[in-house]
C-alpha cells in the first residue's frame, strides 16, 4: 500500500482495506465477526509473551466478573520477512547441519534459538459457565504474574522474570514447593538462558 502511495501520490491507491492489514487488532476483530462474539475484544502484543499475556488477561477478566467466557491464545507466523528481521539480532542457532539438535535450552553448548510458527487457543471461563454448557474442564488458573525488564528491549535481566514468578506465586497463594512444572521461555541464547535460570533458581533452588 505504501509503495502504491509513493508511486501515485494518492491515498486512494492504498485501498480501503490497507489500514486493517497493518493493525494487529485486526486478527481478533475478524475472529469476533466470524464467531459473532460481543464481549471484550483486544489483541495482546507482548512479543514472545503475547499468548501467555492473553491467557492472564482472560483470567483477570473472568475473575473480576467482567466476562463469563473468553476465547484467548497466541499465534506466530513464520515468513521470510519476519525471520530475516529477527535474525538481525543474531539470536538464531547456526547449527544448520543438526536441525533436530540445534535448539539446546539451558545447555552449556547452546548457541541460539530455532525459529518456528504455530498457534493455540484456549477457552477461559467461569466455573459455573463451563458446567452449564457441559464443557470438559482441563485445568484451573489460580494466579498470574507479568513483569517487564525495564532496562533493555531485547537483553533480559533477572529482575523482570523473577518479579513475574513472585507475583504469580503470591496471587495464586501457593509456595514454590507446590509447583511441579515450570514452562520456561528457554530461548537457548547465551544471555537469555543464564538470566532466566537465575530467576527460576531464586524461587525453586
Regions found by a protein language model. Give the residues of each.
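Conserved catalytic cysteine-centered active-site region
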Residues: 1-57, 89-114, 197-205
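Residues on a specific face of well-ordered alpha-helices
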Residues: 25-29, 33, 56, 60, ...
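Short acidic/polar capping segments at secondary-structure boundaries
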Residues: 37, 47-50, 75-78, 128-129, ...
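Short loop segments at secondary-structure junctions
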Residues: 65, 125-129, 204
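Acyl-CoA/ACP chain-elongation machinery
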Residues: 66-111, 144-158, 184-194
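Condensing-enzyme catalytic core mediating Claisen C-C bond formation in acyl metabolism
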Residues: 97-174, 180-181
Amino acid at each position: 500500500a505504501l509503495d502504491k502511495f509513493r508511486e501515485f501520490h494518492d491515498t486512494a491507491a492504498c485501498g480501503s482495506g490497507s489500514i486493517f492489514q497493518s493493525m494487529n487488532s485486526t486478527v481478533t476483530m475478524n475472529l469476533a465477526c466470524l464467531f459473532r462474539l460481543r464481549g471484550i475484544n483486544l489483541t495482546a502484543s507482548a512479543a514472545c509473551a503475547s499468548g501467555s499475556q492473553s491467557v492472564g488477561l482472560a483470567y483477570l477478566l473472568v475473575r473480576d466478573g467482567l466476562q463469563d467466557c473468553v476465547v484467548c491464545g497466541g499465534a506466530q507466523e513464520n515468513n521470510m520477512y519476519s525471520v530475516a528481521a529477527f535474525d538481525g539480532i543474531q539470536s538464531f542457532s547456526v547449527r544448520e547441519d543438526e536441525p533436530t539438535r540445534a535448539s539446546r535450552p539451558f545447555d552449556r553448548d547452546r548457541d541460539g534459538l530455532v525459529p518456528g510458527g504455530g498457534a493455540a487457543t484456549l477457552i477461559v471461563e467461569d466455573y459455573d459457565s463451563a458446567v452449564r454448557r457441559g464443557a470438559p474442564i482441563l485445568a484451573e488458573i489460580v494466579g498470574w504474574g507479568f513483569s517487564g525488564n525495564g532496562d533493555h528491549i531485547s537483553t533480559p535481566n533477572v529482575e523482570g522474570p523473577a518479579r513475574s514468578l513472585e507475583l504469580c506465586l503470591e496471587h495464586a497463594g501457593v509456595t514454590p514447593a507446590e509447583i511441579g512444572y515450570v514452562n520456561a521461555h528457554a530461548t537457548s541464547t547465551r544471555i537469555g538462558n543464564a538470566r532466566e535460570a537465575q530467576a527460576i533458581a531464586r524461587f525453586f533452588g
